[in-house]
Amino acid sequence: MFENITAAPADPILGLADLFRADERPGKINLGIGVYKDETGKTPVLTSVKKAEQYLLENETTKNYLGIDGIPEFGRCTQELLFGKGSALINDKRARTAQTPGGTGALRVAADFLAKNTSVKRVWVSNPSWPNHKSVFNSAGLEVREYAYYDAENHTLDFDALINSLNEAQAGDVVLFHGCCHNPTGIDPTLEQWQTLAQLSVEKGWLPLFDFAYQGFARGLEEDAEGLRAFAAMHKELIVASSYSKNFGLYNERVGACTLVAADSETVDRAFSQMKAAIRANYSNPPAHGASVVATILSNDALRAIWEQELTDMRQRIQRMRQLFVNTLQEKGANRDFSFIIKQNGMFSFSGLTKEQVLRLREEFGVYAVASGRVNVAGMTPDNMAPLCEAIVAVL
């Protein structure tokens, strides 16, 4: 039976990590997978996380199963982070949150819930987007369509093309938006553009699904939620798949959340019971450790202050690396203008490098980036910047 199975293609991002590990060149540089690295090239455990873990080590009394939807305090903290403390939506009990195995788990839970319990057949994602979006929705039996997003020539959001292509989306279609730090372009709508999209989506009858993996990495925790909150103010129904991998550095703990919003508390309770049924048939209930860490930090003023400062430090380091990257490329004699990179948000930059140039970077210089030309700015350090920029200039 198994001998007739053909091998799956390597994952475009995680497969790159395998190649990087196997590369024995000492000066190799990994700008592929989206993890934060500090000035020394390490992915650190945050101080706030260590302190929360110490607290849990001393105070945890059981390893019993969690409920299907996870830790209640985690859900409460997640909703406040997304919609703001004192949000009308929270006060009216219109939101329910399930703790999930990472942001990917949240997307799959949302996809399974929609496929089984609604008339949704199509999900619209931006072109380009995170490659795994298509796999997740297709695996749940949903069709994936693309809407225009990026103006490659001007390195900007092509908002007119975005609106035009979404004119094809029908009432009852799901439209997926990146909450902030669009992956892979790093280009986000302005608040005014978010409000236009929110208004349009109400008029057209789309169900908004927000993929929110980078809250705090663009401008700040509150500022980065502006787009989502513009939608929440106008929409009776929406779904948010959020992740704590990046902003808490909890990559391998798989801490995510799927938040369902409906018109009233009775409707959301009914719908959420079906979301829990989808979870029960998938992984039964979530693991406790990472979510306990997040809930401990977010509900403790002292720990939260440490975490917010650490998040600010990470965001500012990435912004410094963007500036240094652009300056160093110029110093090394790049024959094109890369200043657009400074305006992008989050970990990634859509560099404009071609597949061929990316391949040459890897084979000739040991510099690893995704074939689309997406580079992880958080993988850059003052030490690797000069060789990196020399390699890029050599392949231009």
Curated annotation (Swiss-Prot):
Its EC number is 2.6.1.1. GO terms for biological process: L-phenylalanine biosynthetic process; L-phenylalanine biosynthetic process from chorismate via phenylpyruvate. Has been used to construct a 2,4,6-trinitrotoluene (TNT) biosensor strain. GO terms for cellular component: cytoplasm; cytosol. Changing R374 to F/Y: Second-order rate constants are reduced by >5 orders of magnitude. InterPro entries: Aminotransferase_I/II_large, Asp_trans, NHTrfase_class1_PyrdxlP-BS, PyrdxlP-dep_Trfase, PyrdxlP-dep_Trfase_major, PyrdxlP-dep_Trfase_small. One of its GO terms (molecular function) is protein homodimerization activity. The modification N6-(pyridoxal phosphate)lysine is found at K246. It is found in: Cytoplasm. Keywords: Aminotransferase, Cytoplasm, Pyridoxal phosphate, Transferase. L-aspartate binds at G34, W130, N183, R374. Its main location: cytoplasm. Pfam families: Aminotran_1_2 (PF00155). Induction: Transcription is increased specifically in response to 2,4,6-trinitrotoluene (TNT) and its indicator compounds 1,3-DNB, 2,4-DNT, and 2,6-DNT. Changing Y65 to F/S: Slight changes in activity. It catalyses: L-aspartate + 2-oxoglutarate = oxaloacetate + L-glutamate. Its cofactor is pyridoxal 5'-phosphate. The keyword Transferase applies. Belongs to the class-I pyridoxal-phosphate-dependent aminotransferase family. Homodimer. PANTHER family: ASPARTATE AMINOTRANSFERASE (PTHR11879), ASPARTATE AMINOTRANSFERASE, MITOCHONDRIAL (PTHR11879:SF22). This is Aspartate aminotransferase. The gene is aspC.
